């Protein structure tokens, strides 16, 4: 535990600033994508990227909303951890992450997607009493209410994958933290479909985009 707090204290200020900035940047792009899709009329093209024989088989598991909401903390800590790997790698990480965000944003504007939560009957679970029900309502109501847009690629999957890829091969990062980052990325991806915030294809897109961007910026 002592080593953990020493590591936290050793994070450069710019690491924490970057974590908060990217969190705000994500939310800003999400809102801007929605707005531009409305203004340009591309929202009329919106479709549900549902693959029934896959998505209808995925069960609803409410407690996964914990991982879904915890992701915001994970996303702040991700850039902070990468800042411990040196400025050169940190710059590459920021470029790759920014490119991933912007690529996702292009999809939001020109290939808008949606989920009808009424049709999917998810509010049945959100209206149950208790902490899990409250967390589900919080997640849904802050993401469009009855209709959620900007599904593909899943930003939850995209950003979590970025945080993992940033530390995956770095010798400065402990094996334990790498395992933690990988496990959290998997759990967050699972949460998006288990609480019916996304469809399966959104996960594929959310993982493919950062894989491409990191391959480009880390090719040397």
Predicted features, each with a name:
Residues 1-75, 133:
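N-terminal transmembrane-helix/juxtamembrane module of multi-pass inner/ER membrane proteins
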Residues 10, 14-22, 91-99, 176-183, ...:
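Alpha-helical transmembrane segments of integral membrane proteins
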Residues 52, 74-78, 158-166, 183-191:
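Hydrophobic, membrane-inserted alpha-helices
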Residues 164-168, 210-218:
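Hydrophobic transmembrane alpha-helices
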């Amino acid at each position: 535990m002592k080593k953990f707090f020493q590591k936290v204290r050793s994070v450069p200020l710019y690491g924490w600033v970057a974590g908060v900035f990217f969190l705000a940047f994500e939310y800003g792009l999400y809102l801007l994508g929605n707005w531009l899709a409305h203004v340009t009329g591309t929202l009329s093209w919106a479709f549900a990227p549902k693959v029934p024989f896959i998505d209808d088989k995925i069960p609803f598991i409410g407690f996964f909303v914990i991982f879904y909401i915890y992701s915001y903390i994970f996303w702040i800590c991700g850039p902070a951890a990468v800042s411990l790997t040196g400025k050169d790698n940190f710059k590459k990480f920021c470029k790759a992450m920014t490119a991933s965000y912007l690529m996702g944003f292009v999809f939001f504007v020109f290939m808008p997607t949606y989920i009808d939560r009424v049709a999917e009957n998810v509010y049945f679970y959100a209206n149950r009493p208790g902490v899990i029900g409250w967390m589900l309502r919080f997640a849904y109501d802050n993401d469009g209410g009855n209709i959620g847009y900007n599904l593909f690629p899943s930003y939850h999957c995209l950003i979590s994958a970025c945080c993992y890829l940033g530390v995956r091969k770095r010798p400065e990062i402990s094996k334990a933290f790498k395992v933690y980052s990988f496990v959290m990325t998997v759990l967050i991806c699972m949460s998006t479909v288990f609480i019916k915030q996304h469809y399966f294809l959104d996960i594929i897109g959310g993982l493919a985009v950062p894989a491409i961007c990191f391959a480009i910026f880390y090719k040397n």
